[in-house]
Structure formats: C-alpha cells, structure tokens
Amino acid sequence: MQYYQMMKALRMLKKPKPGCLGIEIQSVPIPQPKNGELLVKIEAAAINPSDLMNATGGFPYTVYPRIVGRDYAGTVISGASHLVGTRVFGTSGSELSFTKDGTHAEYCIIPEKAAVRMPSNLSFTEAASVGVPFTTAYLALSRGETKGSDIVLVVGALGAVGSAVCQIAEDWGCKVITVSRSGSTDINTVVDPELKRVHELVEKVDVVIDTVGDPLLMKSALNQLGIGGRLSYISAPKQGSIEFSYDMKQIYRKNLKIIGCNSLLLSLVESNSLLKNMVAKFEAGKYKVLNKKIAETSLTDECINSYRKLMNECSTKFVITMSTN
C-alpha cells in the first residue's frame, strides 16, 4: 500500500472553542506501519463520552491536528505477516485520539503488542463497543479492591460502563445491587435519591462503583458503605459544581476509601492487555454488549450529527461503521 493513497477520517485541526464541536470529515493519507506496528482496516469504531469531550476541546493533552476515536474493531492488513488477516478489536488510554491518530477513520496504526483477537461471537459493531466501557469497569472494580465475597453497589447500572461493571462483578462472584433512574433496577434514584432501600436488601455495602458522578448521589452512596468500604468513581459533573463534600468523621471512623479511576492513564498496551483477558468471557457468553442501545452511523456528516446528539445528552451508543458487518 502506497503512502499517497487516501482515506476518510474524522479530524480536529485545532483545539475547539469551549463547548464547540471541532471535528470534520477530511481526506488524509493512509498511514504506513513502522517496525512493530500494524495497519488496521477499521470496520467499526464506537463514539464514547471521552471522544465527545475530546472533540469539544475538553482535554489538555490532545496534540493537534488529530483524528479522534479510542475504540475500534477491524482487520489487520499490513505489518507482522502472522497477524495479517486477523480480526482485532481494541481501545486506548491517552494515546489514540490524543497524541496519536485515532480510530474514527478508515485505517489506523496500532502497536503489534496491542493487537487483540476479536471474540469470534461478536460482530465488528459489537466488538467496537467493548473497549472503553469494559476496561473502565475492570479498572474501577480492581482499584476498588473488589473481592468475590463483596456486595457491590453500582450507580448508573444501565449505562455502558455500569452494565460492564455488573457483569464483571457477578462473574467474580459478587452480589450486585443496581442503581439507576429506572424502575428496572434494584433502586430507582428518582424515588429514592438517598438510596435508603439499600438497607432493605443488605446490611452493608463493601464497594460502590459510581459511573454517574453526581455529587449528591455520590454522597448517598458513600453513606451505604460498611467498615472498610471503598467508593470507586469514574466521572464528574459536566456542568455546575464539581465539588463533593463528605463527613470526615465517617471516613476515618469507618476506614473508608474514595478512589478516582481514569482509564486515560493506561497505555495502549496496558488497555488492550485487559481486553485480551476478556475475550474468553465474551466467547463463553459471560460478558455481553448492550445491543439495544447501539445505533450505527457512517463516516460522513451523519457521524458528526451523532456527536451533536450526544452533546444534547442522548443516551444512544453510536458506532461508526465503514461497511456491512
């Protein structure tokens, strides 16, 4: 493949003004892999909340111009000969989409060490939806020192990350209590914002995984922890105050821990080593993708409109697809 061949990509030329979407479809040269790198033909690439934040100038470490996108599924077409033709999927910490060109393009370069075989029972669209949600979920649980005997309270259990947290925790043997704004979970925060029903279900909670980042709800969740409990959170409010107040006596008397989790601190190789360990779980049906919330979009102005919908708090999981898969 020659360098002068071109591809379509969703790209930022410069840092957007605050709150403005700074992406556009451009034609750029297809990148060429160096030693130790692979060229992947992207078949599908999910749009994550962090992609939206990046596309609106929300990160200080993005280097411009830059192709956006962290998650992907596709086929290796150039690089190590034993991997050419392999279907792969993956994700990234603060490299793809930030300091290296990302996955919202027809082709992308990844390190050979970061290549992960795609689960055989997933479509490209499904596989592209796994990366950020499942690695973030694993990180939140592991940083929360979660054990198989723990009772885990999952705030935002119906979201992409929350659903992944529930599946992983249950696979580890934990008892899971689900929390959301919906009546389909154990606790509905619309009618029980203080999470009082927790005590009807269990005596205490060992771990809280908060995927929402609402200060008042986070405080309510913290109050449910027993001695030695851990609260692990992955998000903060996008608007309004980002301050969180807590009872200092409660923290030290109950020996509690409050832990922040940021998947962007993982390297490409570290992120994908987590995914590699999950492949068998997907193939065994223990981990599943939330298909009902996925909507496919194309690498045209349509995907830019999908970004705009996400700016308006749309809960759909958009996946950019390059062809039928």
From Swiss-Prot:
EC number of this enzyme: 1.-.-.-
Gene3D superfamilies reported for this sequence: Medium-chain alcohol dehydrogenases, catalytic domain
Family of the protein in this entry: Belongs to the zinc-containing alcohol dehydrogenase family. Quinone oxidoreductase subfamily.
Protein name, entry field: Zinc-type alcohol dehydrogenase-like protein C337.11
PANTHER family: PROTEIN AST1-RELATED (PTHR43482:SF1)
InterPro entries: ADH-like_C, ADH-like_N, GroES-like_sf, Lipid_raft_assoc_Zn_ADH, NAD(P)-bd_dom_sf, PKS_ER
GO terms of molecular function: oxidoreductase activity, acting on the CH-OH group of donors, NAD or NADP as acceptor
Main location: cytoplasm
Cellular component terms (Gene Ontology): cytoplasm; nucleus
Keywords associated with the record: Cytoplasm, Nucleus, Oxidoreductase
The species this protein was found in: Schizosaccharomyces pombe (strain 972 / ATCC 24843)
Subcellular location: Cytoplasm; Nucleus
Record-linked Pfam families: ADH_N, ADH_zinc_N
